Regions:
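Alpha-helical hydrophobic helix detector
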Residues: 19-35
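Conserved loop-to-helix junction within protein kinase catalytic domains, corresponding to the end
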Residues: 72-76
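Hydrophobic positions in long alpha-helices of the protein kinase catalytic C-lobe
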Residues: 48-52
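N-terminal leader/signal peptides at the extreme start of proteins
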Residues: 1-13
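Short, surface-exposed interaction loops/tails
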Residues: 2-5, 38, 42-46, 57-60, ...
């Protein structure tokens, strides 16, 4: 073909080629997407377990300094602010100025004395309701 014959034709992908690419991308998303979603759900639960471990270390430091764990009414706030002007309090015991929330944006629950040990520290999980099974199960320091 001469240059004059090609001048009217535009280069690019045909409609069939675009449809084939979209079908392939859709198949890949259908296969890979659910697996990635399951991993993301599991990673939030793992974050809760790691944050609880961090809280446990900080609670131990509080206990060494004050001679006891924070009461239920003092809660985890006692880790970042002196609850009731305790003379032996040497905090803050957490690296942040606020108590972190769980990955679902809800406050961690704390009880002292606990039902499972000296204290109970737990998240109600993604549903935010006590109990639950599977991905909605509560995650606590006693598990």
């Amino acid at each position: 073909m001469s240059d004059s014959e090609n001048a009217g034709r535009e280069t690019g992908f045909s409609l069939i080629e675009l449809i084939v690419v979209l079908v392939i991308l859709g198949l890949l998303a259908g296969i890979v997407g659910p697996r990635i979603y399951d991993k993301l759900k599991g990673s939030k639960q793992q974050i809760v377990r790691l944050q609880i471990k961090e809280f446990e270390g900080s609670l131990q430091l509080f206990s060494f300094d004050v001679g006891r764990f924070p009461s239920t009414s003092e809660g985890l706030e006692g880790m970042v602010r002196n609850p009731g002007n305790l003379e032996s309090w040497r905090g803050p015991y957490l690296s942040k100025s606020e108590v972190p929330k769980d990955p679902w944006g809800k406050a961690y629950n704390y009880r002292c004395p606990g039902q499972h040990g000296d204290y109970d520290l737990f998240s109600y999980g993604p549903d935010g309701v006590e109990g639950g099974e599977g991905e909605n199960a509560d995650i606590g320091n006693w598990q």
